[in-house]
From Swiss-Prot:
Protein name: DNA mismatch repair protein MutS
HAMAP family: MutS
Positions with a binding annotation for ATP: 621-628
One GO CC term on file: cytosol
An example molecular function term from Gene Ontology annotations: damaged DNA binding
Database matches in PANTHER family: DNA MISMATCH REPAIR PROTEIN MSH1, MITOCHONDRIAL, DNA MISMATCH REPAIR PROTEIN MUTS FAMILY MEMBER
NCBIfam families noted in UniProt: mutS1 (TIGR01070), PRK05399.1 (NF003810)
Family, as annotated: Belongs to the DNA mismatch repair MutS family.
Role, per record: This protein is involved in the repair of mismatches in DNA. It is possible that it carries out the mismatch recognition step. This protein has a weak ATPase activity.
Organism phylogeny: Bacteria, Pseudomonadati, Pseudomonadota, Gammaproteobacteria, Alteromonadales
GO biological process: mismatch repair
Organism this protein belongs to: Pseudoalteromonas translucida (strain TAC 125)
Bilayer-crossing regions: none
Length: 861
């Protein structure tokens, strides 16, 4: 519409109901408004058009504005959660406007107000959440010096973290790890292209990103004078982001947030850093197609509880370097295996369920009746769990038991207060157990026993009056009455008060019936009102226990992860890794944790040795021979050791790794206009610029996307730089057999190959890693296996012979190719003379300076 919908003169022209709608909508212009009208939530104007398109619902019209029909769409109130779930998944936010006034007493439109705002990052209703995935609200801020501050909150657990990073690469990796459901960024944020793929990205006003305001908000939330005790006081960029996030949560939730009790600063030096390419290539929790199948998480995650599943995924994405913490996890797994308790612990933990999110909903006052029974079941499951673990000598397990004590008073309260199987909603009552409150029992009994009382009264009045046809009736206009035929009207006692005269009957009321009427008509509504009051009172009783319950939930999630990894180790024949102070890697008969689960035939295990004498393995062998699998399994075994898991190997000694890099596979990045080769080179540059001697680097087929000599030269220079300049532990797979000569020239380089046996025109892949370089690539044999026509294979063989004969005469060796590469590099890079000439300002040179400069330039030639 061309006119200003929210202008005062426009609003005045509307009906009273539409005036009310527009005033409320003007406060929530950027999001959808669900406006409650009877049994429906209605949407109007552009909201109606958008909702009709997104939800595939009918669009109608109601009234006119500016001479045009007002678009309208609606959803039934009883099905609203389903529609909200769909909108949230699309990244939409919705303001829920409810009727808060009494229609019976309202003059004009019933009073309405927005009672909650549902956004992708702040939802708490279990119907809207993925139970085994974190649902994070994230806020980002970039300072003038380029530092990124990132704050993220899981409102369903109260975990509130901040981190600062200094590069686009680190920022992208962090956002990929968090996978936020909703992301807030400032109007001045320049690198929007780094976050534009996030459905729930929201631009916020610049004034919301203010350090002083952030510090005030956070201190107010935590009840502290400053933030020193949390260790975040110096992280100014992160605090600015956290302040915006906290204000947003307060605005959308509109209630206290008692379960958000602390803020934690992440330290990158404590973690094994994974960049975005590594997370993608290793398929940790998402496969290359965007699904969950055949990922590391799918193999490892058999947790009993959703909160345990979420914790396991967080650990997979945040491997740590702290040996004490890792050994604590590994020793706890060993203790569980020693007492053979995996199965029993799993069943006990299943009874505890997702208590983490239940506690958050209780804190947010959005819990439903069945959340109370879930908390009750969790508390009831603690006693048998303690019995199982009472004799545990492991310090971590003992600490878990200490952090999850039984709470008999709270358990007894919930057992008394809530029925065994309550309804989904409190709306219609039937949640509070009989015997919990005597007044509620009285109102319920009165409502349920009304018929019996009336039957007894009717019999008594018949006997008292002698009128056998006397009966008690009810209608909405006159309420309860005693009906007597006109023929018997003369028998009516004096205390009967006429209420209505009909053609053949008279209707009366007596004080006892009037008293009963008042009680019965009000008993159901009074029972429901009292039950809702008692239900809300339960929240207040639970509130003082929130902090203790959160500690309990975190401890039990940890136990679930440890028990799950113990079961995986037992079932899948994993070994306990030994964590070393050096940066060596020694794996005996390692296996790929995912591939071995999907293969029908037995997986061929292989060793890996990386140390000062074997810094880099140059891996050759045929396509389909297993080079990529061998490299990936090494990275996954190292990663699993750094999350505190047993590993798929006969044994493993894993050193202190600071980062894992992968350059495996590539595809065009069409959205950014980057070719496959450009993507490959960008990832290679990231590795060469960031790897250290403590890094594990996986390089697969560097240099494929350009000419043979260019590709070979780049592969040579990359391998040489990694080995000679960085000394990173590297697995370098290649089809450039010329690179195998590097092992003779560079200390610490070793050739290995994936074995294959050729018989006539066929090939058998042995998938065994052997020392030495491969003899050939078997490319034609693999092509034949793929179904390439025989005539094409034969022609390729003839061409291959010609090329091999020609190459033996003309092809330069590796040193010559390196020289060529260096010459090319020199041609690309400006010489010292060129740099000096570029810097000259002729207008500001004296004759003497010009003379001296000429001699200097000549000396540089």
């Amino acid at each position: 519409m061309s006119f200003d919908l929210y202008a005062p003169h426009t609003i005045k022209q509307q009906t009273p109901m539409m005036q009310q709608y527009l005033k409320i909508k003007s406060e929530h212009r950027d999001i959808l408004l669900f406006y409650r009208m009877g049994d429906f939530y209605e949407l109007f104007f552009d909201d109606a058009k958008r909702a009709a398109q997104l939800l595939d619902i009918s669009q109608t019209q109601r009234g006119k504005a500016g001479g045009d029909p007002i678009p309208m769409a609606g959803v039934p109130y009883h099905a609203v959660e389903n529609y909200l779930a769909r909108l949230v998944q699309m990244g939409e936010s919705v303001a829920i406007c409810e009727q808060v006034g009494d229609p019976a007493t309202s003059k004009g439109p019933v009073d309405r107000k927005v009672v909650r705002i549902v956004t992708p990052g702040t939802i708490s209703d279990e119907a809207l959440l993925q139970e085994r995935q974190d649902n994070l609200l994230t806020s980002v801020w970039q300072s003038k010096n380029g530092t990124y501050g990132i704050a993220y909150l899981d409102i369903n657990s109260g975990r509130f973290n901040v981190v600062e990073v200094n590069t686009d690469e680190a920022f992208t990796s962090t956002i990929q790890r968090l996978a936020p459901a909703e992301l807030l960024y400032s109007e001045s944020f320049e690198n929007v292209h780094l976050i534009e793929h996030i459905k729930g990205a929201r631009r916020r006003p610049e004034w919301e990103f203010d350090l002083d305001t952030a510090q005030h908000l956070l201190c107010e939330q935590f009840g502290t004078k400053d933030l020193v005790g949390f260790g975040v006081d110096k992280a100014h960029c992160a605090l600015v982001a956290a302040g915006c996030l906290m204000q947003y949560v307060k605005d959308t939730q509109r209630i206290a947030l008692p379960h958000i009790r602390a803020i934690t600063l992440e330290h990158n030096e404590h973690a094994v850093i994974l960049d975005a390419a590594t997370r993608k290539n290793l398929e940790l929790t998402v496969n290359l197609s965007g699904g969950f199948e055949n990922t590391l998480a799918q193999v490892l995650d058999k947790t009993a509880t959703p909160m345990g599943s979420r914790l396991l995924k967080r650990r997979i994405h945040t491997p740590v370097r702290n040996k004490d913490e890792l050994n604590s996890r590994l020793n706890a797994i060993s203790a569980i295996l020693d007492v053979q308790l995996c199965g029993e612990l799993h069943e006990s933990l299943r009874e505890i369920g997702d208590v983490e999110r239940v506690i958050a909903r209780l804190a947010l006052c959005t819990a439903r009746p069945r959340d109370l029974t879930r908390l009750r079941s969790a508390l009831q499951a603690l006693a048998p769990l303690h019995t199982l673990l009472n004799d545990a000598s492991d310090p971590r397990i003992a600490s878990i038991i200490k952090q999850s004590p039984e709470l008999p008073d709270l358990q007894a309260l919930l057992e008394r207060a809530v029925i065994e199987n309550p309804p989904v909603l409190i709306r219609d009552g039937g949640v509070i157990a009989p015997g919990y409150n005597s007044e509620l029992d009285e109102w319920r009994n009165l409502s349920k026993g009304a018929t019996d009382v009336l039957d007894q009264l009717e019999l008594r009045e018949r006997a008292r009056t002698g009128i056998s046809t006397l009966k008690i009736g009810y209608n909405r206009v006159h309420g309860f009455f005693i009906e007597v035929s006109r023929a018997n009207a003369h028998l009516v006692p004096a205390d009967y008060i006429r209420r209505q005269t009909l053609k053949n009957n008279e209707r009366y009321i007596i004080p006892e019936l009037k008293e009963h009427e008042d009680k019965v008509l009000g008993s159901q509504s009074k029972a429901l009102a009292l039950e809702k009051q008692l239900y809300e009172e339960l929240f207040r009783f639970i509130a003082p226990h929130i902090e203790q319950l959160q500690i309990m939930a975190a401890a039990l999630a940890d136990l679930d992860v440890l028990n799950n990894l113990a079961e995986r180790a037992l079932t899948l024949n994993y070994a306990k890794p030994i964590l070393c102070d050096n940066d060596n890697i020694s794996i005996k008969q390692g296996r790929h944790p995912v591939v071995e689960q999907v293969m029908k035939e037995p997986f061929i295990a292989n060793p890996v040795e990386l140390n000062a004498q074997r810094k880099m393995l140059i891996i050759t062998g045929p396509n389909m021979g297993g080079k990529s699998t061998y490299m990936r399994q090494t990275a996954l075994i190292v990663l699993m050791a750094h999350i505190g898991s047993y590993v798929p190997a006969d044994s493993a000694k894993i050193g202190n790794i600071d980062r894992i890099f992968t350059r495996i596979g590539a595809s065009d990045d069409l959205a950014s206009g980057r070719s496959t080769f450009m993507v490959e080179m960008t990832e290679t540059a990231t590795i060469l610029n960031n790897a250290t001697a403590q890094s594990l680097v996986l390089m697969d087929e560097i240099g494929r996307g350009t000419s043979t000599y260019d590709g070979l030269s780049l592969a040579y220079a990359t391998a040489d730089h990694l080995a000679s300049k960085i000394s990173a532990k590297t697995l370098f797979a290649t089809h450039y057999f010329e690179l195998t000569e590097l092992a003779e020239q560079t200390p610490g380089l070793v050739n290995v190959h994936l074995d294959a046996i050729e018989h006539n025109d066929t090939i058998a892949f042995m998938h065994t890693v052997l020392d030495g370089a491969a003899s050939k690539s078997f490319g034609l044999q693999v092509a034949a296996l793929a179904g390439v026509p025989r005539s094409v294979i034969n022609q390729a063989k003839q061409k291959l012979k010609l090329l091999e004969n020609h190459q033996s005469v003309t092809a330069p060796n590796i040193e010559q190719q390196a020289f060529t590469f260096n010459n090319q590099a020199q041609q690309i890079s400006p010489s010292e003379v060129e740099l000096q000439l570029t810097a000259i300002d002729p207008d500001n040179l004296s004759p003497r300076q010009a003379h001296d400069l000429l001699y200097k330039l000549k000396a540089l030639l």
